[in-house]
């Protein structure tokens, strides 16, 4: 896969004088449009870093592609306003009318004619060791640089074979997860061997992203919903939630 990034990154936060005279580090927002085969696909509002990773991860977790092997090139313009992904095949459009679907996280929307997305498939099993969850929780508690500066962003860590492979930050939890997934894809590491740890909530859309990424387990310091537990159980995703007492992807009526 060829990668052309003329943008790189911009300042993720600015120091702002508050009304009471104190100064605070405030995160910045960056808007970009992700194009697939020259057609607009998503508008994202994100932290202005790791745009190739965000775009690649977004295509996988939203079901537009089944693997990174379908992507021939990722190109980011100098201003970071346009991210182009070129596939080795045309996209198959749905028969339904086009819609814009807003995300509950930041101001992200899907653009243009929807495509036939990849169906959800059962994820592989992985024996998640208790020490792995502890290591992820410790890393999350320590905080990443942008969070330490602003306390206003989400994080997503990737664990591979017991070691933290990468960690990504963004103003949106969906974006942070997509950046982490994209980073793993660009590194050539099998997602089937990875565990994701998100700082955000895990409703159905986050569980769906993890399933489409093909990871065996998703860990969060927050609690899931009944529906996200059911979806995780249906496709074999280990859902480990809660600071002290992680839940499995099973549930009991109450």
Task: Name these PLM-found stretches.
Residues 1-161, 166-167:
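Intrinsically disordered, low-complexity regions enriched in acidic/Ser/Thr/Pro/Gln residues
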Residues 55, 170, 198:
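Short glycine/serine/threonine-biased micro-segments
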Residues 159, 250-252:
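Short beta-strand-to-turn element immediately C-terminal to the catalytic PLP-Schiff-base lysine
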Residues 173-250:
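Feature captures the catalytic cores and cofactor-binding loops of soluble hydro-lyases/lyases
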